[in-house]
Curated annotation (Swiss-Prot):
InterPro entries, sorted: aa-tRNA-synth_II/BPL/LPL, Ala-tRNA-lgiase_IIc, Ala-tRNA-ligase_IIc_anticod-bd, Ala-tRNA-synth_IIc_core, Ala-tRNA-synth_IIc_N, Ala-tRNA_ligase, Ala_tRNA_ligase_euk/bac, DHHA1_dom
Primary localization: cytoplasm
Organism: Salmonella typhimurium (strain LT2 / SGSC1412 / ATCC 700720)
Record NCBIfam families: alaS
Gene Ontology CC: one annotated term: cytosol
Record key words, sorted: Aminoacyl-tRNA synthetase, ATP-binding, Cytoplasm, Ligase, Metal-binding, Nucleotide-binding, Protein biosynthesis, RNA-binding, tRNA-binding, Zinc
Gene symbol of the encoding locus: alaS
Catalyses which reaction(s): tRNA(Ala) + L-alanine + ATP = L-alanyl-tRNA(Ala) + AMP + diphosphate
Binding, Zn(2+): 564, 568, 666, 670
Record-level Gene Ontology MF annotations: alanine-tRNA ligase activity; aminoacyl-tRNA deacylase activity; ATP binding; tRNA binding; zinc ion binding
Enzyme Commission number(s) from the entry: 6.1.1.7
Cross-referenced CDD domains: AlaRS_core (cd00673)
Protein name: Alanine--tRNA ligase
Cofactor: Zn(2+)
Length: 876
């Protein structure tokens, strides 16, 4: 009996654990501290800084099953998903890694043992082929002489992409940096499937499938293209779980493995589909995986960046559900079946199931309202299309009006062998793209891309002043030896009391001072293991190696500490009041305010806000000690410490406890006791996205300032009402009641005036072939009274056509009324449109009543004068 996908995942991890590898959990799909990546798309992403030498771990061997998404950006598989055997938006990458430990010999031997060992995957050896880089004789000889693969099944692949080292078998992190040859392992499905071995003209067939890529990082590529050997060569491998599952379960398509069969059956059940071979079932089964895990990792549907990619995937799935005949929202119902098939890999998703389902349901409901109309418009455009290309303007209109991502439109068109003018679409989208996705893209400023080889020691938990030494200087992202007065720069010290922005807490400000120089620090950021002080040299000169005195702005840091501690108290209070589904989705801890985004599906009630406030202030009054302990990550979690899912933690973590009320992992700076916070007040609660709420709050002096401001406002109102704050409610209710009474009396007077005006106007009507025509501009009449007057005049005049106008603050208001017996000849909507066009406006309505507005009051007399001729022509 073949292994299940879950068993294959576990077997891989167990194998490498038995070989001395640390089993590391999958990192978030949102890359941590890497502005160059849209989504985590490979197992090595979370170890990038380790390979670059910017991060150190307490292990030199690791193994993971990493969740990955490839959709959007460079890796965009979206249009192929569901239509090929192996394209996915979401997949799991099995990997083993060596950080300066073992190299080619062990990496190859491990792979061979796992794939062919009787106690492991037990694949037939004769079915396995390998490729090596053309000049990698070492790997070739290991495969041939040690493993025993015949030469005819070992293929050398050279520079097949048009440049030196541009090869399927040479891996590079970028234009510079770690790189090296790789060896790939292929599985031969047999001659009953078309295709040739790698490197042959038929290599794109499905007979020979790559199942494992083993990268040997042995060089450091310089800017001039030269390759320098790395002092500690490393190994990075990747094997797609879905691919190896297909091989081990003896199927040719990833969509036929047990995991996808179960999901496809679930999709068929919720959509009512009966043909399990329908490609739309595959599309939806794939898309629920990426969408559910993206939402669980904090991505929400939006019109920019990651959120836009998520929206595109959701809407593509919904449209395929529509094709299958789904009559109601269905997509969110697949989260449960997904959790079941993921097993232990779906535990975090299970904890957030309700939140994920709500986000997906809300997005589907929003799109469903326009999907049918949008598809109808697209069908109409395609039906009258001359040629085989849909114009970009129509594609843009579908996006702008109906929320159709262009790739969804392209999907529909592809099914009819029609192309989309994407260049025209991009031209029409230029303004929106600049305002949304491009404007807020991932370029980051130059500071984010600085690479610092040195490390800084943070001593700011215990010190706000410290002597240190300059180890690096950067100007415009480039390393320099010295800076002069007036220059902006990033200064790196060997040790510093300045806290670098992290975990939502803003970076410190202050000064670096020394012999004849002063550097004003405006921000502090992390660069790998270094801490950079961003600012401007206000006096003197500063060079690498100089001694400095680092002084943190003490008052500002103190306010930040209070706000950070209050954030922890509020997080715990929210979970008590609203439920344990509350999870942090983002935060800002500054010296002025604390902002906290959290998962919750509805606006908080005033009573809930008050309860959270009261709970936090109760803990402040308890004056609990705020204690920190350093311990192993597993021990901290066992103690109940809350960890932020997707946050990157070291093996040793800092646990912050506030009595028995709150325990969290946190590297930030905090008060000594909860009583230091003084007072906590929530100043706003709002929604930021589906299923996400935001609270802003203040503490200490800031909280007292809000109390004083509120008291001052109450006193001002009491003074205006000639009362005091004690009976203010009664006073306001009395004023409101009196106001309502006066407004009622005023309306009665206006109605009487309008009725009188209508009576006066009726005598001005002229007869046109038995129809009374009345056209008049009225002064001093509110626009909303015109409708009442038209109704009165229609009752008085019988067969009639009426046009009334008034001008208020330069804006023209128009109304046309036509008695029902005349609407077969004169339509009020057409009439009002003719008049409105002349005064710079537009309008519309029913055949018997229509309204309009305009901006050109000077043109009104001429416009009204044209009515009689227009109506006369219609009545003839």
């Amino acid at each position: 009996m073949s292994k299940s996908t879950a068993e294959i995942r576990q077997a891989f991890l167990d194998f490498f654990h038995s070989k001395g590898h640390q089993v590391v959990a999958s990192s978030s799909l949102v890359p941590n501290n890497d502005p160059t990546l849209l989504f985590t798309n490979a197992g090595m992403n979370q170890f990038k800084d380790v390979f670059l030498g910017l991060d150190k771990r307490n292990y030199s061997r690791a193994t993971t099953s990493q969740r990955c998404v490839r959709a959007g950006g460079k890796h965009n598989d979206l249009e192929n998903v569901g239509y090929t055997a192996r394209h996915h938006t979401f997949f799991e990458m099995l990997g083993n890694f060596s950080f300066g430990d073992y190299f080619k010999h062990d990496a190859i031997q491990f792979a061979w043992e796992l794939l062919t060992g009787e106690n492991w995957f037990a694949l037939p050896k004769e079915r396995l082929w390998v490729t090596v880089y053309e000049t990698d004789d070492e790997a070739y000889e290991i495969w041939e002489k040690e493993v025993g693969i015949p030469r005819e099944r070992i293929i050398r692949i050279g520079d097949n992409k048009g440049a030196p080292y541009a090869s399927d078998n040479f891996w590079q992190m970028g234009d510079t940096g770690p790189c090296g040859p790789c060896t790939e392992i292929f599985y031969d499905h047999g001659d009953h499937i078309w295709g040739g071995p790698p490197g042959s003209p038929e290599e794109d067939g499905d007979r020979y499938i790559e199942i494992w890529n083993i990268v040997f990082m042995q060089f450091n590529r310089q800017a001039d293209g030269t390759m320098e050997p790395l002092p500690k060569p490393s190994v990075d491998t990747g094997m797609g779980l879905e691919r190896i599952a297909a091989v081990l379960q003896h199927v040719n398509s990833n969509y036929d493995i047990d995991l996808f069969r179960t999901l496809i059956e679930a999709v068929a059940k919720v959509t009512g589909a009966t043909d399990l071979g329908n490609k739309s079932l595959r599309v939806i089964a794939d898309h629920i995986r990426s969408c559910a895990f993206l939402v669980a990792d904090g991505v929400l549907p939006s019109n920019e960046n990651r959120g836009y990619v998520l929206r595109r995937i959701i809407r593509r799935a919904v449209r395929h559900g529509n094709m299958l005949g789904a009559k109601e929202t269905f997509f969110y119902k697949l989260v449960g079946p997904l959790i079941e098939v993921m097993g232990s890999a779906g535990e975090e998703l299970k904890r957030q199931q309700a939140q994920v389902e709500q986000v997906l349901k809300t997005e589907e409901e929003q799109f469903a309202r326009t999907l049918e109309r949008g598809l109808a418009l697209l069908d109409e455009e395609l039906a009258k299309l001359q040629g085989d290309t849909l114009d970009g303007e129509t594609a843009f209109r579908l996006y702008d009006t109906y929320g159709f991502p262009v790739d969804l439109t392209a999907d529909v068109c592809r099914e009819r062998n029609i192309k989309v003018d994407e260049a025209g679409f991009e031209a029409a989208m230029e303004e929106q793209r600049r305002r949304a996705r491009e404007a807020s893209g991932f370029g980051a400023d130059y500071n984010a891309m600085i690479r610092v080889d040195s490390a800084s020691e943070f001593k700011g938990y215990d010190h706000l002043e410290l002597n240190g030494k300059v180890t690096a200087l950067f100007v415009d992202g480039k390393a320099v030896e010295a800076i002069n007065a007036g220059q902006e720069a990033v200064v790196v010290l060997d040790q510093t009391p300045f806290y670098a922005e992290s975990g939502g807490q803003v970076g410190d400000k202050g000064e670096l001072k020394g012999a004849g120089f002063t550097f004003a620090v405006d921000d502090t950021q992390k660069y790998g293991q270094a801490i950079g002080h961003l600012g401007k040299l206000s006096a003197g000169a500063l060079k690498v190696g100089d001694a400095v005195q680092a002084d943190v702005d003490e008052a500002r840091r103190a306010r930040i500490r209070l706000n950070h501690s209050a954030t922890h108290l509020m997080h715990a209070a929210l979970r008590q009041v609203l439920g344990t589904h509350v999870a942090q989705k983002g935060s800002l801890v500054s010296d002025k305010v604390l902002r906290f985004d959290f998962s919750h599906n509805e606006a908080m009630k005033p009573s809930e806000i008050r309860e959270v406030e009261d709970l936090v202030n109760a803990q402040i009054r308890r004056n609990l000690p705020i204690e920190t302990n350093i311990m192993d990550l597993d021990a901290a979690k066992a103690k109940g410490a809350m960890a932020l899912f997707g946050e990157k933690y070291d093996e040793r973590v800092r646990v912050l406890s506030m009595g028995d009320f709150s325990t969290e992992l946190c590297g930030g700076t905090h008060a000594s006791r909860t009583g230091d916070i003084g007072l906590f007040r929530i100043i706003s609660e709002s929604g930021t996205a589906a299923g996400i709420r935001r609270i802003e709050a203040v503490t200490g002096e800031g909280a007292m300032a809000t109390v004083h401001a509120q008291s001052d406002r109450l006193n001002d109102i009491a003074h205006l009402l000639k009362g005091d704050s004690q009976n203010l409610g009664d006073k306001v209710r009395a004023v409101l009641e009196r106001t309502r009474q006066l407004e009622k009396e005023l309306q009665q007077l206006k109605d009487q005036a309008a009725a009188q005006e209508s009576a006066n106007l009726s005598s001005k009507a002229v007869d046109l072939n038995g129809v009374k025509l009345l056209v008049s501009e009225l002064a001093g009449i509110e626009p909303k009274m015109l409708r009442t007057m038209v109704d009165d005049l229609k009752n008085q005049l019988g067969s009639t056509v009426i046009v009334l106008a008034t001008v208020v603050e330069g804006k023209v208001s128009l109304i046309a009324g036509v008695s029902k017996d005349v609407t077969d000849r004169v339509k009020a909507g057409e009439l009002i449109g003719m008049v409105a066009q002349q005064v710079g406006g537009k309008g519309g309505g029913r055949p018997d009543m229509a309204q309009a507005g305009g901006t050109d009051a000077a043109a009104l007399p001429a416009a009204l004068a044209s009515v009689q001729g227009w109506v006369s022509a219609k009545l003839q």
